[in-house]
């Protein structure tokens, strides 16, 4: 018994010792001020963070078969379209195409996507939902290349309204064919079209239309091209027929481009005109300066050939004549004719000199003259005067064949040469020979060539401008 009593006392003392070592808590009688929540944290309930059951999903995507179009089996579903053109990136004459960046938007109603909303607000999604629902299969007719932009993410937007109306928008760059007519190039205007059409659904299943008529096409005012002036954008629509599949609604984005002429004036027309004018310089060069006139003619011909080759290299190989071809080839003909003109002048000069030598051999100078030289007269003397100056009696008349256009005489320096002095043909007592260096063809060419080229330019610019 004493043993148990001692054990109980020992345990009691141990408990008292343990309690005495614990820290004592002070009782607070005041009020604790809690921090006030900031207005930044006052958010509405985020429904995306609430896990709901399948029947409670707003769009109920998994409950419907979206492989079929809306109202399948009924009338054609109307799909409105509007386009905002962001830029015209390039126009290629060689490939006969254009590149355009645009925002393409579709509008339709799909009751399978209707949802209840107390605030009647729409919901916006990115491109991931597009793969789960039905969207129109619009494609670009006659397109060569096209892609949807994906920087920094896919440029696709889907907006669904509570009543089931859907807005589907995407940003696209497309390169499409443009049938160009270069018969008036570079004084031409081109009309190109971007065509939109449903790939699978005929007009019995899908009715594609411009949502607001011509107002459905918007363009950026800053759109500009280096070689073209954008004159007009407008929309049209019509039906397209395929013998195997039927009729389809097709929408057209039409735009008209007028080419800037100033670039081609500097690069093509002015150089060609200068080459033609340079070829006329040979008409003022001495006809006996063969190297100068020949080298000038060849240089202008080769330069015109280079200009024509450079222009054709930047153009498609069309089977008809362009306006610039007419101008360049006519200019080339003028340059080439200037070369032929000198060939004719040189030939006639050679023939003339040969006849003069024969004439001198036929009528040798046996008039007892101390000093004599041959003189070529320019035709201002009569036949009798020329013969008298030559020391021949009037009965001896040179024939026209002998004289040709120039009369060659032997002039004696004697006291009876007063008639020749009267004509100013003698200087002192020594005879000399006067050469008429400018041929008659050169004289006429100085007027005919410039007048003809100016007349051609007047007709050309009045027809094509």
Curated annotation (Swiss-Prot):
CDD domains: LGIC_ECD_GABAAR_rho, LGIC_TM_GABAAR_rho. It is a multi-pass membrane protein. PROSITE patterns: NEUROTR_ION_CHANNEL. It is found in: Postsynaptic cell membrane; Cell membrane. It catalyses: chloride(in) = chloride(out). Belongs to the ligand-gated ion channel (TC 1.A.9) family. Gamma-aminobutyric acid receptor (TC 1.A.9.5) subfamily. GABRR2 sub-subfamily. This is Gamma-aminobutyric acid receptor subunit rho-2. Residues 1-20 form the signal peptide. Residues 21-260, 315-325, 465 are extracellular. Glycans are attached at residues 120, 254. GO terms for cellular component: chloride channel complex; GABA-A receptor complex; GABA-ergic synapse; intracellular vesicle; plasma membrane; postsynaptic membrane. Keywords: Cell membrane, Chloride, Chloride channel, Disulfide bond, Glycoprotein, Ion channel, Ion transport, Membrane, Postsynaptic cell membrane, Signal, Synapse, Transmembrane, Transmembrane helix, Transport. The chain crosses the membrane at residues 261-281, 294-314, 326-346, 444-464. Pfam families: Neur_chan_LBD, Neur_chan_memb. Rho subunit of the pentameric ligand-gated chloride channels responsible for mediating the effects of gamma-aminobutyric acid (GABA), the major inhibitory neurotransmitter in the brain. Rho-containing GABA-gated chloride channels are a subclass of GABA(A) receptors (GABAARs) entirely composed of rho subunits, where GABA molecules bind at the rho intersubunit interfaces. When activated by GABA, rho-GABAARs selectively allow the flow of chloride anions across the cell membrane down their electrochemical gradient. Disulfide bonds join 178-192. PANTHER family: NEUROTRANSMITTER GATED ION CHANNEL (PTHR18945). The keyword DNA-binding does not apply. GO terms for molecular function: GABA-A receptor activity; GABA-gated chloride ion channel activity; protein domain specific binding; transmitter-gated monoatomic ion channel activity involved in regulation of postsynaptic membrane potential. 4-aminobutanoate binds at residues 105, 169, 197. Residues 282-293, 347-443 are cytoplasmic. SUPFAM superfamilies: Neurotransmitter-gated ion-channel transmembrane pore, Nicotinic receptor ligand binding domain-like.
């Amino acid at each position: 018994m004493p043993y148990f009593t001692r054990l109980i006392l020992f345990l009691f003392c141990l408990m008292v010792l343990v309690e005495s070592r614990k820290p004592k808590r002070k009782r607070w009688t005041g009020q604790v001020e809690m921090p006030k929540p900031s207005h930044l944290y006052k958010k509405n309930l985020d429904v995306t963070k609430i896990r709901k059951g399948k029947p409670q999903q707003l769009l109920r995507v998994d409950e419907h078969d979206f492989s079929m179009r809306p109202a399948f089996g009924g009338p054609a579903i109307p799909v409105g379209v509007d386009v905002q053109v962001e830029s015209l990136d390039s126009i290629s004459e060689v490939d006969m195409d254009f590149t355009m960046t645009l925002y393409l938007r579709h509008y339709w109603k799909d009751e399978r996507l209707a949802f209840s909303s107390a605030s009647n607000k729409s919901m916006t999604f990115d491109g991931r939902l597009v793969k789960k629902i039905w969207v129109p299969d619009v494609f670009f007719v006659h397109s060569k290349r096209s892609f949807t932009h994906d920087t920094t993410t896919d440029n696709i937007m889907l907006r669904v309204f509570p009543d089931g109306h859907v807005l589907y928008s995407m940003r696209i760059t497309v390169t499409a064919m443009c049938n160009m007519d270069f018969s008036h190039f570079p004084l031409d205007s081109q009309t190109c079209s971007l065509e939109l059409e449903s790939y699978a659904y005929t007009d019995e299943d899908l009715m594609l239309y411009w949502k607001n008529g011509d107002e459905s096409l918007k363009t950026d005012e800053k759109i500009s091209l280096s070689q073209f002036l954008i004159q007009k954008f407008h929309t049209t629509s019509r039906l397209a027929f395929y013998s195997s599949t039927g009729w389809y609604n097709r929408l057209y984005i039409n735009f008209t481009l007028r080419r800037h002429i100033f670039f081609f004036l500097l690069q093509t027309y002015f150089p060609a005109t200068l080459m033609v004018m340079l070829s006329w310089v040979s008409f003022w060069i001495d006809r006996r300066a063969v190297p100068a006139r020949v080298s000038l003619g060849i240089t202008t011909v080769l330069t015109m050939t280079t200009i024509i080759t450079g222009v054709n290299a930047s153009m498609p190989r069309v089977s008809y004549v362009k306006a610039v071809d007419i101008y360049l080839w006519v200019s080339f003909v003028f340059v080439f004719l200037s070369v032929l003109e000198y060939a004719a002048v040189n030939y006639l000069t050679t023939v003339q000199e040969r006849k003069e030598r024969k004439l001198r051999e036929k009528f040798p100078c046996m008039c007892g003259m101390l000093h004599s030289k041959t003189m070529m007269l320019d035709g201002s003397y009569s036949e009798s005067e020329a013969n008298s100056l030559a020391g021949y009696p009037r009965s001896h008349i040179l024939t026209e064949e002998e004289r040709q256009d120039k009369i060659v005489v032997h002039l004696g320096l004697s006291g009876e040469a007063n008639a020749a002095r009267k004509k100013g043909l003698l200087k002192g007592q020594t005879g000399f020979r006067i050469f008429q260096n400018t041929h008659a063809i050169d004289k006429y060419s100085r007027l005919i060539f410039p007048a003809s080229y100016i007349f051609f330019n007047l007709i050309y610019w009045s027809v094509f401008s």
